[in-house]
């Protein structure tokens, strides 16, 4: 490619500016003489930093080209496999597509949990670096850091309004944050070991937490007092999640079981024992999934007329299981991940399940046909957490590679 005289002149001036501003005086004077440049102040200003700017914009363009090539290849793939690119996909069937929209760095240790805000276009991430970070998922901008924990932050949870954020940590505490003023409202002490999971109950009055001390505790938001303790697990309790109306909570543990508890009485309603290793994660099925689950499992509607509730669990045995809690039965097992399953969630549309694992992938499951329909190589290291936005077409993932990635769905 041949440069015009004007382009050559511009390039020479930009090189001269670069040599001079970086202290290569000798090279600068020789180059200036050989290129026959007469540098004056006005020109100097015009060419200041130009070479670096060109250089970075070339890198940016290369990245964009690679992204577009990747999108084009995906479109070709869908076209040849007769995928739904011609007809418009129903948003209920949108799934995350590579490449990621943003790869965000800022955490200095593995990312442990990622969640979307229920109202605003922000997401929150927790990390082993003892911080919680807030990001705008639409622009990819970092907004702020919440500091207070003194050890790895293990889990975070919003109330339904998004005004309160709960966090828990290996420092054995639970913190409640005002998400409008971004200050810590109170700190709850009571667990005797690493607090691995936290969730604000649907009514917003209570918080549940799970710990390596083998217990689950319920706390009053207003006072910070512990009002209930659920005991029964024989090992570290990894995760606790309330169902939609807050009458039940599910928990999973290193004892390889999933338990479902009745909140009012503290009794264990079900103990589910089919996993063959530590159960890392659980997720309740939204009502939007009930009809697909019934089709998939052929389970007739119960006499009471209402199906479910259903629960997902993901384990270090590399499988995902779906359970019908009303009968305490495993309805299906999804096999495909090559390593520990770390996160599992229903697609808001109800037709798919998303999971992430230590095999560095996100997988999208068409569970009606019990098959993995898409695998995304998501991170450079274990994928620890994922969240699917309830209304906007975004998925967020966090990883041991210390990055957070935002994926657009279409």
Curated annotation (Swiss-Prot):
Annotated Gene Ontology cellular component terms: 1-alkyl-2-acetylglycerophosphocholine esterase complex; axon cytoplasm; centrosome; COPI vesicle coat; cytoplasmic microtubule; kinetochore; microtubule associated complex; neuron projection
Localization per Swiss-Prot or TrEMBL: Cytoplasm, Cytoskeleton; Cytoplasm, Cytoskeleton, Microtubule organizing center, Centrosome
Keyword annotations: Cell cycle, Cell division, Coiled coil, Cytoplasm, Cytoskeleton, Developmental protein, Differentiation, Microtubule, Mitosis, Neurogenesis, Repeat, Transport, WD repeat
Main localization, broad class: cytoplasm
Renumbered ranges of WD repeats: 106-147, 148-189, 190-229, 232-271, 274-333, 336-377, 379-410
Domain of life: Eukaryota
One of the record's GO molecular function terms: protein heterodimerization activity
Pfam families noted in UniProt: LisH_PAC1, WD40
Intrachain disulfide bonds: none
PROSITE patterns linked to this entry: LISH, WD_REPEATS_1, WD_REPEATS_2, WD_REPEATS_REGION
Coiled-coil segments on the chain, per record: 56-82
GO biological process, one term: retrograde axonal transport
InterPro entries: Coatomer_complex_subunit (IPR050844), Dynein_regulator_LIS1 (IPR017252), G-protein_beta_WD-40_rep (IPR020472), LIS1_N (IPR037190), LisH (IPR006594), PAC1-like_LisH-like_dom (IPR056795), WD40/YVTN_repeat-like_dom_sf (IPR015943), WD40_repeat_CS (IPR019775)
Family in the record: Belongs to the WD repeat LIS1/nudF family.
HAMAP family found in the cross-reference section: lis1 (MF_03141)
Domain note: Dimerization mediated by the LisH domain may be required to activate dynein.
Biological function: Regulatory subunit (beta subunit) of the cytosolic type I platelet-activating factor (PAF) acetylhydrolase (PAF-AH (I)), an enzyme that catalyzes the hydrolyze of the acetyl group at the sn-2 position of PAF and its analogs and participates in PAF inactivation. Regulates the PAF-AH (I) activity in a catalytic dimer composition-dependent manner. Positively regulates the activity of the minus-end directed microtubule motor protein dynein. May enhance dynein-mediated microtubule sliding by targeting dynein to the microtubule plus end.
UniProt subunit comment: Can self-associate. Component of the cytosolic PAF-AH (I) heterotetrameric enzyme, which is composed of PAFAH1B1 (beta), PAFAH1B2 (alpha2) and PAFAH1B3 (alpha1) subunits. The catalytic activity of the enzyme resides in the alpha1 (PAFAH1B3) and alpha2 (PAFAH1B2) subunits, whereas the beta subunit (PAFAH1B1) has regulatory activity. Trimer formation is not essential for the catalytic activity. Interacts with dynein, dynactin, nde1 and ndel1.
Record protein name field: Lissencephaly-1 homolog
Origin species: Xenopus laevis (African clawed frog)
Taxon lineage: Eukaryota, Metazoa, Chordata, Craniata, Vertebrata
């Amino acid at each position: 490619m041949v440069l015009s005289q004007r382009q050559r002149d511009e390039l020479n001036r930009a090189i001269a500016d670069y040599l001079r501003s970086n202290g290569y005086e000798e090279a600068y004077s020789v180059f200036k003489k050989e290129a026959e440049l007469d540098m004056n102040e006005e020109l100097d200003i015009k060419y200041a930093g130009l070479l670096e700017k060109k250089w970075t914009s070339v890198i940016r363009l290369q990245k964009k080209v690679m992204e577009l090539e990747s999108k084009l290849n995906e479109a070709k793939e869908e076209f040849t496999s007769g995928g739904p690119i011609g007809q418009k996909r129903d948003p209920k069937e949108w799934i995350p597509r590579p490449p990621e929209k943003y790869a965000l760095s800022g955490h200095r240790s593995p990312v442990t949990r990622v969640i979307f805000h229920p109202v605003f276009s922000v997401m929150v991430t927790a990390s082993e670096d003892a911080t919680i970070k807030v990001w705008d998922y639409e622009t990819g901008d970092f907004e702020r850091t919440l500091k207070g924990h003194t050890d790895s932050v293990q889990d975070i949870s919003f109330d339904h309004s998004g005004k309160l954020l709960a966090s828990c940590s290996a420092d054995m505490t639970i913190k409640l944050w005002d998400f409008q003023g971004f200050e810590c409202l109170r700190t709850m002490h009571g667990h005797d070991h690493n607090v691995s999971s936290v969730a604000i109950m649907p009514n917003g009055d209570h918080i549940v937490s799970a710990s390596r001390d083998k217990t689950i505790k319920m706390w009053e938001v207003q006072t910070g007092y512990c009002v209930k303790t659920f005991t029964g697990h024989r090992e570290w309790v990894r995760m606790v999640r309330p169902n939609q109306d807050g009458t039940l909570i599910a928990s999973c543990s290193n004892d390889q079981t999933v338990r479902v508890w009745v909140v009012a009485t503290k009794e264990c309603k079900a103990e589910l024992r089919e996993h063959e290793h530590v159960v890392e994660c659980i997720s309740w099925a939204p009502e939007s999934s009930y009809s697909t689950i019934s089709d998939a499992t052929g389970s007739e509607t119960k006499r009471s007329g209402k199906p479910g509730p259903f629960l997902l669990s993901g384990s270090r045995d590399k499988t995902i299981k779906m359970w019908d809690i009303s009968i305490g039965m495993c309805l299906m097992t999804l096999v495909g991940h090559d390593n520990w399953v770390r996160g599992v969630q229903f697609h808001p549309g109800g037709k798919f399940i998303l999971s992430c694992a230590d095999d560095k992938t996100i997988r999208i499951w068409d569970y009606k046909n019990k098959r993995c329909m898409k695998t995304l190589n998501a991170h450079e290291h274990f994928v620890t957490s994922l969240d699917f936005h309830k209304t906007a077409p975004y998925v967020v993932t966090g990883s041991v590679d210390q990055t957070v990635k935002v994926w657009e769905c279409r």
